[in-house]
Amino acid sequence: MLKNIRSYFYNLKKYQTPLEKYVFPVILLLFPLIGANAGLDITDTTYSLGNYQYLDTVNQMWLFSTFLSNKAGQLIMMLPGAGTMLGFNIWCSFITSAMALVSYYFLKRFMPGWMIFIGEFIAQALCFSPRGILYNYLTYLFLTMGTIFLIAGLFAIERQNLYLIIAGVFLGMNVMVRFPNLAEASLILIVWFYGRITRDKLTEVLKKTGLCILGYVCGFGVVFLGTCVGYGGPDAYIGGIAELLGMTKGASDYTSGGMLGAILEAYGTSLSHMLIVLPCIVAGVIMFLLLPGRYVWVKKFLYMAGLLVLVRFFFARGVFTRNYYYYDCMFQAAMMFVIVGIIFCTVGSLGILNGSRQEQTLAFTALMLILVTPLGSNNYTFPILNNLFLIAPIILWLFRRLMQRMGDEDWNFPWQSFVTTVIIVLFIQGALFHINFSFYDGADGTPRDARLDIPKVSSMVTTSYNAETLTDLYSALGDNELLEDKVLLFGTVPGLAYIFDLEPAIDTTWPDLDSYYYMNFDSELLGLDTAGETPTVILGKDSPDISSDKSKYDTLMDFIDNHDYNIVFESDRFIVFASK
């Protein structure tokens, strides 16, 4: 099979250099811009943008647990054009471009550019998180940069110490991007792994470890000192992180057990879907071992036909879907790729491929990234899919290395063709997902064919229902002269503060989140009462959080009743209360 692949692509060799030098980088630069104006979600996406805009009002837990990402968002909003949602999205899209391009040029030292491009294209296509949620994308950017400098430091002859310190700086700063990134300190195992396979002296390994720790402390320490200077000492930061660590009392999915259980559940589900593949591969191997060397192309044709039937079966069972407006179109294919990648990385780390020490280290690095990335998140294994910039190209490279190691025997065709099928399906599904997906908005396939006359989001396309209901709400706020008032939002509508430029009256625009304590909410309302403030209250009517946390809802209703609020607008989606 390997000879056939090589001979087929040999004639294209003359195009490889210009493609790798010019075309692929341009595609990786521009591909993330697709969909920058798609969708107008009023939950997570615009919640983050609202936090950047009104950062001075954000409660200390959220401010400090995602400090650098909040400050970065605030800074980006000052850039040309970033005062609109489209402009902000465009600027943030280049973070994804940067991760892909930096990884592309770094990995070209070890593997062909076309292979890296396929991996980077897949990585960009699977980025599901809204581009404005910077505590995700800065996390992946700093993790990617830290890992690259770590590997460069281990492999370098010159400037080794500098690279290791810089690696530590990026990973240390990443804790200030998002506090759970503390788990990334476990990447020091890469240093120890490299020392083990190269038989470095213990003193040399300890020296490299110390340099990484020095950089880590400096990266974290500089930003921490900045918070101390800006917020009157360390107490504010320590208090915010202490509140974060106590958050699990009201949000079970943020406990260590809950997060680990979700990760294992995702792997378990995907493995259960892959069980049918094992007998297919075994049957294929047996078929090629029977009458060896005879009817090879007939056998290959029959096996590929069987793989097409298997893909059709996965579509019929809902493992793969054609709903390119939602995650399930690509999630299981991506998880199959990751699971296969774990196998390849394990094999590569153990040295079974008889590759170089660099190859072993890259394999172990990809394995560590797969294991570490989802830690600290309650989003199953989705963080891995958003952070494949180093992982995907290394998996593809190890796949080719394993093919080379196993040789050209025909019985290898079944497992090789299955992995190739997964890659092709993922490439196609991922590309279609990237082109069509928008976070929440139109996730059921409803066309996004409408725009709003609201200045900040006028360039965004959304569903007709979303556009109509938001326009009606905006008009009602204007008619009642409420657009200049502060606002209290409840019912999974935090993004309204950003969309309508409404300053929050309390320290969050999403008080109905489980992670926001009832005591905090009660205290904020008491503060409004004491100050005699009666902000506009906008209630989302279709929020599941209202029924799940009645205590907050009841407290809000008591506040409304006690301050002579009236309903000035009501639709099937929103209720507006005003005390005027």
Language-model-derived ranges and their functions:
Residues 90-112, 287-289:
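Transmembrane-helix motifs of polytopic, lipid-linked glycan transferases
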Residues 103-125, 162:
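Transmembrane-helix signature of polytopic, membrane-embedded enzymes
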Residues 4, 184-221, 225:
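Perimembrane helix-loop-helix junctions
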Residues 34-51, 60-76, 82-83, 230-235, ...:
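Extracytoplasmic catalytic/substrate-binding loops of multi-pass membrane glycan-assembly enzymes
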Residues 431-514, 534-546, 572-573, 577:
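Short periplasmic/luminal acceptor-recognition loop of GT-C membrane glycosyltransferases, typified by
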Residues 126-128, 162-190, 214, 218, ...:
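Membrane-interface alpha helices of multi-pass inner-membrane proteins
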Residues 149-173, 202-211, 359-366:
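Short hydrophobic alpha-helices at membrane interfaces in multi-pass membrane enzymes
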Residues 131-140:
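Short acidic/glycine- and proline-prone juxtamembrane loop motifs at membrane-interface regions
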